[in-house]
Amino acid sequence: INFETIICHIIVFFAFTSAIIYLCVYILKVPIPHSFFYLGKNGLRYFSYGGIYYDQGYSNIQFGMNLNRMTGPFWEPGVYQIFLNYALYRYVVIEKSNKFVIALLLFDIFFTMSASGWLCAIVIIVIGIAKSPKFTNKSKIFIFIFLSLFGGIATKFVLFSKFSETFSNKSSAYIRMNDFLLGLKIFIENPILGIGFNNTEPFMMRNTYNDTGILGSSNGFMTIAYTTGIVGMVFVLLPFIYNIIKRKKERYKSVLYFIMIVFFNFSEPVYYFPFMMYILVKEYRKAFKNSTLSI
């Protein structure tokens, strides 16, 4: 059994169900039975559609329209895009899947309205096309220009909303920037070993600009840095770098994969999620086997 294939098939399943529910509820306005539940210490209310799609039920102004951001089976669109882009990478760069699956993943990524998700998807598509023998050089240049223009314009709209939307009267971009700076400051104060594995309380106590949860920061990579120091970062990054060096053919795939995983952790606090633990263990297993497998 290929566990990687199973994971990506599950992601595609949720991408399909999320697309159907999103289209029915928010585009076609078809009423679907749902329940409510409350999450976190602030008691944020979520709509639950059969336990496979969650939504807070409010919309944002995107492209001049009121649009709900697609969250899939998660509480946050930014987390959902991580899984979507993970599958997109595999089906574009590794396995060359059918166009329907790729289009489905891109549809969901678009409606997450996640700037980081869009950027990651565009890079994956551009590299996939650049390395594909099916496209002529002229076609590649045209597609690259189109994606760059589309990505730039679309990202501009999303980033504008990031700076204008409020969370306790502060934009999410403001919060992310300050999370990074505070995490960096704590890391500089404790560079070698950090302040302790999974110890996010000092960050929470010094955070005066936002209500911080137990994850400690919106920047997962910086949380690894300030809690475990240089030693922890070496432990996390070493197998990826080693596997890149050991790979002889198509090294760009491993480089892109490494950048993507680091980027995921920069954009969301997913550093200790089982999914990220699986990815880290997989890289160590590959390193110990001294092989150059496909991912």
Can you describe what each PLM-predicted range is?
Residues V255-I295:
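Transmembrane alpha-helices of multi-pass inner-membrane enzymes
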Residues I20-K29, T112, I129-S168:
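A membrane-periplasm/extracellular boundary helix in multi-pass inner-membrane enzymes
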Residues F160-T228:
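Long extracytoplasmic/lumenal interhelical loops at the membrane interface
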Residues A15-G51, V158-S171:
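Aromatic-rich transmembrane-lumenal/periplasmic boundary elements in polytopic membrane proteins
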Residues K29-R69, E201-G216, G220:
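Interfacial juxtamembrane loops and adjacent helix segments
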Residues E95-K99, I122-K140, T227-V262:
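Hydrophobic transmembrane alpha-helices and their immediate junctions
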Residues C8-I32, Y53-M113, C120-K131:
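Alpha-helical transmembrane segments of multi-pass inner-membrane proteins
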Residues G72, F110, Y209-I244:
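A conserved mid-to-late transmembrane alpha helix and its immediate loop/hinge
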